[in-house]
């Protein structure tokens, strides 16, 4: 088994190779004069090849890189190609919102499936959309690794884990279960792409260390509003935790300025707040899916 990692997946790829006791080979990346991408993988591959690449922003560019890297692995002799795409672009466009629109995530899933025998992703925005892949696909959770990290970092503190909305409730529950602490969630109404309104809800947070956890932090709007609601209820120190730290539109600056002590993220996308690796559950999924 060999692990191929693009520049977007190299940190996770290195850790995954260690977990699998496999060889790691970086993917060479270059551009033609017109800006088009070209990748190169080791020639004369054989056996199982694991391709690690994240579709972090810029998503369209990284979607193309995923497609051509998987094609390169297949064309250079891989007998089995397992795609590790920890963050899947377009995952929030999983249905037709207006007449005439595509189901964008379905199109992306089909494109990535073309040169893969199996695919693994992490904390997919809507797990039910795994059905859009044309190959066996597994969605693994970062909850256990996040929970272990929080349990060690906040040992002895009066900790509570909060989901910023109903959609984050299950992740908050799983993380809190690993930590052995209480959990709850807030309720929100989305006003626009980066504007939300948090509905008042009484929570037992006064004076406590609070970790707000969600599958992804994009613009940070939800987290900022959630922090305001929790501070109004007397919460102590606030932390923001997530699987996918996209952190667009100066989100990190907004979060820290709004009172968060720190941001805790995994290595599914390149980011400066990575403290937790999803390599262990991904490695387990590779072993389960590999023929």
Curated annotation (Swiss-Prot):
D-ribose 5-phosphate binds at residues 190, 214. It catalyses: D-ribose 5-phosphate + ATP = 5-phospho-alpha-D-ribose 1-diphosphate + AMP + H(+). Pathway: Metabolic intermediate biosynthesis; 5-phospho-alpha-D-ribose 1-diphosphate biosynthesis; 5-phospho-alpha-D-ribose 1-diphosphate from D-ribose 5-phosphate (route I): step 1/1. Mg(2+) 1 binds at residue 125. One of its GO terms (biological process) is 5-phosphoribose 1-diphosphate biosynthetic process. Signal peptide: none annotated. It is found in: Cytoplasm. It is an enzyme of class 2 (transferase). SMART domains: Pribosyltran_N (SM01400). ATP binds at residues 34-36, 92-93. Pfam families: Pribosyltran (PF00156), Pribosyltran_N (PF13793). Involved in the biosynthesis of the central metabolite phospho-alpha-D-ribosyl-1-pyrophosphate (PRPP) via the transfer of pyrophosphoryl group from ATP to 1-hydroxyl of ribose-5-phosphate (Rib-5-P). Belongs to the ribose-phosphate pyrophosphokinase family. Class III (archaeal) subfamily. This is Ribose-phosphate pyrophosphokinase. It comes from Methanopyrus kandleri (strain AV19 / DSM 6324 / JCM 9639 / NBRC 100938).
């Amino acid at each position: 088994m060999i692990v191929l990692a693009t520049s977007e997946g190299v940190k996770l790829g290195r850790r995954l190779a260690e977990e699998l006791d496999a060889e790691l080979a970086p993917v060479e990346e270059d551009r033609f004069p017109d800006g088009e991408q070209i990748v190169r993988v080791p020639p004369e591959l054989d056996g199982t090849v694991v391709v690690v690449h994240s579709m972090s922003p810029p998503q369209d560019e990284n979607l193309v890189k995923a497609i051509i890297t998987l094609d390169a692995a297949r064309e250079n002799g891989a007998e089995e190609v397992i795609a590790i795409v920890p963050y899947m672009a377009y995952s929030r466009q999983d249905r037709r919102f207006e007449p005439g629109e595509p189901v964008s995530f379905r199109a992306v899933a089909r494109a990535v499936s073309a040169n893969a025998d199996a695919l693994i992703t992490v904390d997919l925005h809507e797990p039910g959309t795994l059905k859009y892949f044309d190959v066996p696909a597994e969605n693994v959770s970062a909850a256990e690794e996040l929970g272990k990290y929080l349990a060690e970092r906040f040992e002895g503190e009066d900790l509570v884990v909060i989901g910023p909305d109903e959609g984050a409730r299950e992740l908050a529950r799983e993380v809190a279960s690993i930590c052995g602490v209480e959990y709850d969630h807030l309720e929100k109404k989305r006003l626009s792409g980066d504007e939300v309104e948090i509905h008042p809800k009484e929570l037992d947070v006064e004076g406590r260390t609070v970790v707000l956890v969600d599958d992804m932090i994009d613009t940070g709007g939800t987290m900022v509003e959630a922090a305001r609601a929790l501070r109004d209820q007397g919460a102590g120190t606030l932390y923001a935790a997530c699987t996918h730290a996209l952190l667009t539109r100066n989100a990190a600056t907004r979060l820290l300025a709004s009172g968060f002590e720190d941001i805790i993220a995994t290595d599914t996308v390149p980011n400066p707040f990575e403290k937790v690796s999803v390599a262990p559950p991904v490695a387990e999924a590779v072993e389960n899916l590999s023929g």
